[in-house]
Swiss-Prot record:
Subunit structure: Homodimer.
One GO term describing the cellular component: cytoplasm
Gene this chain is encoded by: maf
InterPro entries per the UniProt record, alphabetical: ITPase-like_fam, Maf-like
Domain of life: Bacteria
UniProt miscellaneous comment: Overexpression results in extensive filamentation caused by a disruption and subsequent inhibition of the septation process.
Xref: Pfam families: Maf
Protein name per UniProt: dTTP/UTP pyrophosphatase
EC number: 3.6.1.9
Active site: D70
Cystine crosslinks: C74-C79
Length: 189
């Protein structure tokens, strides 16, 4: 019998992407506080957070296979989290305007006797944005729950000049790499 699969995330985008695999799974949100370790690189931080999220749920459900994930938007060595308010969202979008940044998504899969954690890094270039474009976007409320204050799968796509890497990773779950990793847990789509 296959072990139950759990997604340890409340992200509607991650749910949407995991649905593409057409596998039965449940959602149990991890209560891990998303604090960064200043001694870690962005890649180390995002992997550490994904692992903590998956482990927190796996510890409560030891007979399940648990997927945890985390995404960070990084510019000039600084990681941009979710904006706290509209002013911070505007500030983030001004910084991203006309520039390239990295989006790093880590996935951690935890099971009783096996675990796997990896990350995917994608480069995204933005067009130059006017103040009007920034504030019109913020008024949609779309940027308020997203790292870097934009969603590539929504109106934020209008800001993207070029993407080099996995689009789905920018959305929050590199689905192809995740499926390949799940094969190591005897799960196939």
């Amino acid at each position: 019998m296959t072990k139950p699969l759990i997604l340890a995330s409340q992200s509607p985008r991650r749910k949407e992407l995991l649905d593409l695999l057409q596998l039965p799974y449940s959602i149990i949100v991890s209560e891990v506080e998303e604090k960064l370790n200043r001694n870690f690189s962005p890649e180390e931080n995002v992997q550490w957070l994904a692992k903590q999220k998956a482990k927190a749920v796996a510890d409560l459900h030891p007979h399940a296979i648990v997927i945890g994930a985390d995404t960070m938007v990084c510019l000039d060595g600084e990681c941009l989290g979710k904006p706290q308010d509209q002013e911070e969202a505007a500030s983030m979008l001004r910084r991203l305007s006309g520039r390239s940044h990295s989006v790093i998504t880590a996935v951690s899969i935890q099971a009783e006797n096996h675990s796997e954690t990896f990350y995917d890094k994608t480069e995204v270039a933005f067009w130059s944005l006017s103040e009007e474009e920034i504030w019109t976007y913020i008024e949609t409320k779309e940027p308020m729950d997203k790292a870097g204050a934009y969603g590539i799968q929504g109106r934020g796509a209008l800001f993207v000049k070029k993407i080099d890497g996995d689009y789905y990773s920018v959305m929050g779950l590199p689905i192809s790499k995740t499926m390949r990793a799940l094969r190591h847990f005897d799960i196939r789509a």
